Amino acid sequence: MYPLRFDHIDLRVRSVPEVEAFYDLLMPAFGWVRKSYAHVDAEGEWHDVDAEHPCNAVEYFAPSDGVRPPCFIGFIEDAGMQTSRTRIAFALGSPLELIEWEPRLREFGARCIERSEDMDGYPALFFEDPAGTRLELCARKVTGPEAGQP
């Protein structure tokens, strides 16, 4: 049995066009290169885009591990959406990568970019997409039993 992992995230945004250009740069930089479009109705059902179902969602897919389907993030348009304090964090391989990412985030159009107050203890960059969705890049260290320590 595999450890549980997330399959997908449905993230509501006020406007897909408001954030799409940002995620078109960010997600491929993470290696999430496959993109698709969909229509999500009021009941949350997903449909292919057609004359009856106009595009109101964009999805970015991570590469498959060859065993399970690829996970994805779907940005779904909801004009009444208010941003929340929820944050999605993506893991980097090392704290040195954070230094490389900071200017890239600015180039992509990220807002409110801040370094962790404790870059040694918790190396991370906090930022927002153009709609105010809170995101994070972190490079947590392996400690405790995972690192062979008591």
Give each language-model segment a name.
Residues 1-20, 31, 87-88, 143-150:
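N-terminal beta-strand motif that seeds the catalytic metal site of vicinal oxygen chelate
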Residues 2, 6-14, 78-150:
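Vicinal oxygen chelate
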Residues 10-67:
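Core segments of cupin and vicinal oxygen chelate
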Residues 20-21, 99, 135:
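Alpha-helical elements of the RecA-like P-loop NTPase motor core of helicases
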Residues 24, 28, 99-102, 106:
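Class I S-adenosyl-L-methionine
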Residues 70-74:
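A short, structured beta-strand/loop element
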Residues 75-79, 139-142:
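Acetyl-CoA-dependent GNAT
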